[in-house]
Amino acid sequence: MSSKRDYYEILEVSRSATQQDIKKAFRKLAMKYHPDRNKDSDAEEKFKEVNEAYEVLSDEEKRKLYDTYGHEGLNASGFHQGGFNPYDVFNSVFSGFDFEGGFGDVFSQFFGGGGSGFHNQEYIEEVDVNLVHEIKINFLEAANGCIKNVKYTRQVTCPDCNGSGSADGDVITCSDCNGEGFLVEQRRTLLGMFQTKKTCPSCKGEGQTIKNKCKKCKSRRMVDEVVERKVSIDSNVFYQDVVIVRGEGHIYKNLVGDLFLRVKIEPSRVFELRDNHVVVNVLVDPLVAITGGTILIPTLKEIKEINLKAGTKNGDIITIANGGINLKLDSRVYGANYNQKGDLIVVINYARPSEYSKQEITKLKEFIKPNKEVNLYETLMKKELNNKDSQ
């Protein structure tokens, strides 16, 4: 199995995301991790991951292949055989943007900021107001759908300073960057002089400094808020592990983010999912299988009693129609099985025989008769050994 991270997880989008959603997520993350802007040790690796994920998910054919077969399907098709340049992807998406002034100007162009400079607060707030939270549910909750009470911490506009960060509203223009929020750096490269803009360390990109800081938020403009929300989760979560709850992310002034709920499904010791079908292995006493009788089987709703016909063999399958999960995914992307209700597939497994008394064993021996399958095996075995001796 591939050790690569899930492409949807990398771009922080759900499996039902539109191309517009995917492109928007890519632009945000590509800017965040671009090595010329982010100096963290792992930024370049994350930048490559983001670009690789976008190259696949932005292409309908590659996306369908990935949705159906995962990374292994892409490997088989030759996608991961080299020649991938993440900067080619980045440049194709951001073609038409002016990079001469550095990344600060790109932010202004992309997000429509009227002012110059990296302190474009609209951009920073837009990418920061979305919130990712993780919850765990069990297999039956996912299969049947459930409503979970989700408790998490988000940030909201500080009520004391109304998001200004100042206790008295008095702010001072930063003298280091003259209110621009950025400092210009020039460096010589093989391609000539390259000019970049980096965040002003004095004002942290705000263009202003605060004399009397708000005591409640310590000039951070936002404070923590613990919230609880009831979230509905359906069986699609098996294949779309991110549930988006609109308007429940961070809140800053008039900007309201979304809650990206990453759902982890705990594995079941009883059930196994195959497409939209649910497989369950049931242990049966061999004598009950031979003579027939009633057995108990687990379904997604309850424990059910069914009649087992005489002569049931080890490995026999009993299919209960519409006993699987009900998926409502785009069949054009996932396939026909992912847009309908599946079946419950019961696999019969012989348990170890019960212990019997000598009298019971003697009585059972009376019913032993030649077994055609055993006889055939013994014939083949003898033939194999006889051929060996004759050589």
Swiss-Prot record:
Keywords assigned by UniProt, alphabetized: Chaperone, Cytoplasm, DNA replication, Metal-binding, Repeat, Stress response, Zinc, Zinc-finger
CR-type zinc-finger residues: 145-226
Keyword Cell inner membrane part of the UniProt annotation: no
Cited InterPro entries: DnaJ, DnaJ_C, DnaJ_domain, DnaJ_domain_CS, HSP40/DnaJ_pept-bd, HSP_DnaJ_Cys-rich_dom, HSP_DnaJ_Cys-rich_dom_sf, J_dom_sf
A GO biological process held by the record: DNA replication
CC cofactor note: Binds 2 Zn(2+) ions per monomer.
Subcellular location: Cytoplasm
GO molecular-function terms, A-Z: ATP binding; heat shock protein binding; unfolded protein binding; zinc ion binding
Keyword Zinc-finger listed: yes
Binding site for Zn(2+) 2: C174, C177, C200, C203
Gene Ontology CC annotation, any one: cytoplasm
Known cofactor(s): Zn(2+)
CXXCXGXG motif repeats: 158-165, 174-181, 200-207, 214-221
Domain J: 6-70
Similarity comment: family membership: Belongs to the DnaJ family.
HAMAP family: DnaJ (MF_01152)
Subunit structure comment from the entry: Homodimer.
Function, in words: Participates actively in the response to hyperosmotic and heat shock by preventing the aggregation of stress-denatured proteins and by disaggregating proteins, also in an autonomous, DnaK-independent fashion. Unfolded proteins bind initially to DnaJ; upon interaction with the DnaJ-bound protein, DnaK hydrolyzes its bound ATP, resulting in the formation of a stable complex. GrpE releases ADP from DnaK; ATP binding to DnaK triggers the release of the substrate protein, thus completing the reaction cycle.
Protein name per its UniProtKB record: Chaperone protein DnaJ
Source organism (scientific name): Mycoplasmoides gallisepticum (strain R(low / passage 15 / clone 2)) (Mycoplasma gallisepticum)
Origin organism lineage: Bacteria, Bacillati, Mycoplasmatota, Mycoplasmoidales, Mycoplasmoidaceae
Gene this protein is translated from: dnaJ
